[in-house]
């Protein structure tokens, strides 16, 4: 039995004067049709008196049907276990819909309280009509348990026969990707078409309006410009694919102050930590290409720690110690979480494919290298060492041994030159094949005036992936700081390094009273700040996108 929504006397009666509020509602026709389909079981006396706007386009009506159906399913039937507490929302949950009404005063971490009054009025009226998601779910659940029988229901609504009752009432879909399990997406076309005319959610651009002040936060501007629906994450939703690559000013890592208020005691530290990882997602402003300086050693002294790469996947710590104990007592450091190197593999995880061997003497390292196969790289004069090792399931596998010559940690071009820390930059994300002399040569070619370069090392005098470069003039220093990211291309590797001002322990340069552990590298500030002065200085919108720098406390503790 076909069910028509066009010529229905019930629908016409729904718009008479018995429900005066409904006659002035912009969604009156849609609500009446829904009420008719549900057997006039809905009480429409509380419908808002929003004036009808015939010419205003709804942004949701321009979206593909597949996206809309999935959003409606999530709006009308939210998951019971969904957490509505404040926090960083998942990109898949930006179709807020009715779920947002359960939050008092729209207290989203990114939303501004200075919103348009007309929008607030519409939001309040919608809340009065539809209630909270739980109330709406209870109404529909009570209706499904009423006296109407299953046979009568299917005769009255034949389109509902295709619906899965479990997914209809207990939909847990939180993403448009899961829309196949949604009741509305797989059910009646009439109901889907009907709901397309309802405005039951504020537009996504309105929700994101206050975030436009900081173009570096999550790159929302570029995401909203995609041809796909803003409710559906693009394929390149990873940080490296979705963030813009702009500089100067600040790191463009996702702003963690979305999770915390600006006064949170950990938000600045989190921003500084994220900035130290920014080289992987920012484009280089300078590129250096060429050959590294040749190396010539006479009786080199090695660090007692070596890198062992390409180890068998099933290797164990006992197997490593048994293999290398003939060269002297040693311990094994496995790559672990949070930049640490625990003495055993992470539980439940496979080894990472490389380990560090720590001997008690550099003589053990020298003996190990003598038993390795040496591959000399020309013209750099850099040797690669390979050691044949076996495991229970792999036989005779070449593992690369990378030692470190202690003299490679420092390079001074002019011993009589006084080193000024105010003209020193920090260089992060260094490649393991870069020694101090090579770093100095590259920086001097790009910026000029290099008098010193040093590679940061741990307690075993093994490099940790960062270094320092000192210039003899401020112009070269500022040019290097402004460059921020430099790509180094050699015949053996290509690596992008990150350049920041070298930080010292300093007093806040704003109040001159408290310690200033936070440094703003933007040229409009370029000062050390204490926590309160940082918030005071950067509370203005024009400065809110500045990101802090901090000294690496873990590195200092390791040394």
Curated annotation (Swiss-Prot):
SMART domains: RRM. Residues 222-243 are annotated as: Disordered. Sequence-specific RNA-binding protein that regulates mRNA cytoplasmic polyadenylation and translation initiation during oocyte maturation and early development. Binds to the cytoplasmic polyadenylation element (CPE), an uridine-rich sequence element (consensus sequence 5'-UUUUUAU-3') within the mRNA 3'-UTR. It comes from the Eukaryota. Belongs to the RRM CPEB family. It is found in: Cytoplasm. One of its GO terms (molecular function) is translation factor activity, RNA binding. Zn(2+) 1 binds at residues 508, 511, 530, 533. It comes from Danio rerio. GO terms for cellular component: cytoplasm; neuron projection; nucleus; protein-containing complex; synapse. It holds the Pfam family CEBP_ZZ. This is Cytoplasmic polyadenylation element-binding protein 1. Its main location: cytoplasm. The keyword Phosphoprotein does not apply. Expressed in oocytes (at protein level). During oocyte maturation becomes detectable at stage Ib, and remains ubiquitously distributed within the oocyte cytoplasm until stage II. It then follows a gradual accumulation to the future animal pole during stage III, and remains localized to this pole at stage IV (at protein level). Expressed in oocytes, blastomeres and pre-mid-blastula transition embryos. Its expression during oogenesis is ubiquitous at stages I and II, but gradually accumulated at the periphery of the oocyte in the presumptive animal pole during stage III. InterPro entries: CEBP1_N (IPR032292), CEBP_ZZ (IPR032296), CEBP_ZZ_sf (IPR038446), CPEB (IPR034819), CPEB1_RRM1 (IPR034977), Nucleotide-bd_a/b_plait_sf (IPR012677), RBD_domain_sf (IPR035979), RRM_dom (IPR000504). Residues 304-401, 423-504 form the RRM domain. GO terms for biological process: cellular response to amino acid stimulus; cellular response to hypoxia; cellular response to insulin stimulus; mRNA processing; negative regulation of cytoplasmic translation; regulation of mRNA 3'-end processing. Zn(2+) 2 binds at residues 520, 525, 538, 546. Keywords: Cytoplasm, Metal-binding, mRNA processing, Repeat, RNA-binding, Translation regulation, Zinc.
């Amino acid at each position: 039995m076909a069910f028509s929504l066009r010529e229905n006397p019930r629908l016409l009666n729904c718009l008479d004067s018995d429900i005066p509020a409904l006659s002035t509602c912009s969604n009156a026709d849609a609500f009446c049709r829904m009420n008719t389909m549900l057997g006039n079981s809905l009480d429409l006396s509380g419908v808002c008196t929003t004036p009808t706007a015939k010419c205003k386009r709804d942004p949701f009506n321009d979206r593909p049907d597949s996206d809309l159906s999935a959003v409606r399913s999530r709006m009308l039937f939210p998951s019971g276990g969904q957490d509505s507490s404040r926090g960083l929302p998942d990109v898949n949950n930006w179709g807020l819909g009715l779920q947002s009404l359960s939050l008092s005063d729209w207290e989203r971490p990114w939303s501004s309280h200075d919103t348009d009054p007309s929008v607030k009025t519409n939001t309040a009226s919608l809340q009065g009509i539809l209630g909270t998601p739980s109330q709406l779910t209870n109404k529909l659940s009570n209706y499904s348990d009423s006296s109407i029988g299953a046979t009568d229901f299917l005769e009255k609504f034949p389109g509902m026969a295709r619906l899965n009752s479990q997914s209809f009432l207990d939909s847990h879909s939180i993403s448009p990707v899961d829309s196949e399990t949604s009741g509305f997406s797989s059910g009646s076309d009439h109901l889907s078409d009907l709901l397309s005319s309802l405005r039951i959610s504020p537009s996504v651009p309105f929700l994101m309006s206050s975030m436009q002040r900081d173009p570096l936060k999550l790159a929302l501007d570029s995401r909203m410009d995609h041809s796909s629906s803003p409710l559906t994450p693009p394929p390149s939703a990873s940080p490296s694919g979705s963030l813009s690559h702009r500089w100067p000013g600040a790191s463009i890592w996702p702003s963690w102050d979305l999770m915390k208020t600006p006064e949170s005691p950990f938000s600045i530290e989190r921003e500084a930590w994220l900035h130290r990882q920014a080289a992987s997602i920012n484009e280089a402003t300078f590129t250096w290409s060429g050959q590294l300086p040749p190396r010539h050693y006479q009786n080199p002294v090695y660090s007692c720690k070596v890198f062992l790469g390409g180890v068998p996947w099933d290797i164990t710590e006992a197997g490593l110690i048994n293999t290398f104990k003939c060269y002297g007592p040693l311990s094994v450091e496995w790559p672990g979480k949070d930049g640490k190197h625990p003495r055993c593999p992470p539980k439940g995880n496979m080894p990472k494919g490389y380990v560090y061997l720590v001997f008690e003497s550099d003589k053990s390292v020298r003996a190990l290298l003598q038993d390795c196969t040496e591959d000399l790289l020309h013209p750099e004069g850099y040797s690669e060492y390979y050691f044949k090792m076996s495991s229970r399931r792999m036989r005779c596998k070449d593992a690369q041994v990378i030692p470190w010559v202690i003299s490679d940690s420092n390079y001074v071009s002019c011993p009589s030159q006084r080193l000024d820390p105010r003209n020193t930059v920090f260089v992060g994300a260094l490649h393991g094949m870069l020694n101090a002399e090579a770093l100095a040569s590259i920086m001097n070619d790009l910026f000029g005036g290099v008098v010193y370069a040093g590679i940061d090392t741990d307690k075993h005098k093994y490099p940790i992936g960062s270094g320092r470069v000192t210039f003899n003039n401020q112009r070269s220093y500022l040019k290097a700081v402004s460059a921020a990211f430099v790509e180094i291309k050699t015949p053996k590797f290509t690596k992008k390094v990150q350049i920041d001002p070298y930080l010292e322990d300093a007093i806040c340069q704003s109040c001159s009273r408290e310690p200033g552990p936070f440094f703003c590298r933007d040229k409009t500030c370029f000062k050390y700040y204490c926590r309160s002065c940082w918030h005071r200085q950067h509370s203005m919108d024009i400065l809110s996108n500045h990101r802090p720098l901090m000294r690496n406390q873990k590195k200092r503790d390791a040394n």
